[in-house]
Amino acid sequence: MVGLASLGLVFEGLVAPVGAQARLPTRFDADVARALRAFNVPGTAIAVVKDGKVLLAKGYGVQRLGDRTPMNAHALFQIASNTKAFTTACLAMLVDSGKLAWDDPVTRYLPDFQLYDPWVTREFTIRDLVTHRSGLGLGAGDLLWLHSNYTRREVIRRMRAARPTSSFRSQYAYDNVLYAAAGEIIPAVTGLSWEEFVRQRILAPLGMTQTRTGVADLRPGDRLATAHAVLGGRLRIVPLDTVDNIGPAASLISSVTDLAKWVSVQLDSGRAGKRRLWSAGQTREMWSSQTIMPIKDPRPSLAILRPNFAAYALGWRVRDYRGHKLVHHTGGLAGMTSKTTLVPDKRLGIVILTNGESSLYEALTYQLLDHFLGARPRDWVAAFQAAARGERASADSELGIVRRMRDTTSRLSLPLARYAGRYSDELYGDATIDLEDGGLVLRFSHSPAFVGDLVYWGHDIFRTNWRTPNLEDAFVVFTLKPEGAVEQFTMEAVSPLADFSYDYQDLRFVPSR
């Protein structure tokens, strides 16, 4: 039950005059400049669509650290998981045309599709692919595609080895690889690749001429923003993630100029001018709650953001804010973060793309939402910075405990050379540990970026020092057989703030020779 205090929060400060919400906030440009400085992000591009009109499509800051080239509305960003709504829109078109149904079994179209249990495999539907209720753990299979040379088909095939962490359809756990499988249904039905279907059925009709289906689709002259992250306390340029091998989950590259067109067709229930891309009924389906998401209490500075409901729909998340339903999604890859937000009953859409890693896109989204919903302004920059400080303090406390547990006085159970060798994990594949210059070096055989020196931590535990600086380090824990040989090694992320795509905990490497 919603208490009176909560209702007071929802309706607090509705003071803007009638008509004010048809315009952008005053001093918005100055507010964006302040946010860029506060969050240490080089640049952002923002689009706002209201009542069928593009109120804003503009860049702020710069495209690259150390370069004065200004950000603009045509700069390209990786939009990461904002791609998922494009994939479900493609499937919705096929539902409209009678080519498939959301509740069709996946194996009807992908006969080789297989998961951890024969019954689950048989019962698994297209809807299950796109609603994060598979029974697999959070981010299951992400290390199969992250910086790897596996093809999309091989990534999907290897998921049969992923172990469940809950019952099928019992709880929410975000999964990227299953969206790649959803995308593979499109060529099975139409003969067109996911990439070509997106181009023909969405990008071309909407005139989204600046949007690319992945890194391989980039063309000479494309204005791609540079990715940035804070490493070792300093803002640095980081390599672009190439995620074409799970394209339907995360690979689209776009600008706010193009995404304003995408938001407009969403808010008009699939209609673009006189042409309809998908039906109003499919819009309702894609925006309907499918999998309940757990609601956690936010940090105190963000208490007002605690929703009354939260769920995953079809390629979108849905929740409430100040009495309105939000349809939204975020996207994040190395050095680039973004968010798309729709408020259907206000015919409002907001897109924020950034070339850094921070909650800047959240702060600016809520500033714009408050303005257009007629709420009293809040300092969302300060609120999200306070929350981030709290998260870092908690993580630092946990890391401090871990560091104090390091025991380099303990002796290794085996000579270093006995830990070296070739290992295999049923899900990921092969890895090698080599003895080089008196130390151990771990290599993931299908992920060239994952090469790391193993630093002894104590008690047959090592910590990776990946040579690619923006990868999340992991503990490598060896288990020995009674006779003294290595039985296996497992891994887990060092930092509590590590992105869930570093699903080291799912790996169990055993000697393969």
Protein language model annotation of sequence segments:
Residues 176-177, 360:
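Short acidic alpha-helix initiation/capping motifs at coil-to-helix transition points
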Residues 62-176, 183, 190-192, 200, ...:
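Active-site-proximal loop and beta-strand segments within enzyme catalytic domains
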Residues 2-13:
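Bacterial N-terminal signal peptides
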Residues 16-20:
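Sec/Tat signal peptide C-region and signal peptidase I cleavage site
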Residues 125, 178, 255-258:
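An acidic site on a long C-lobe helix of protein kinase domains
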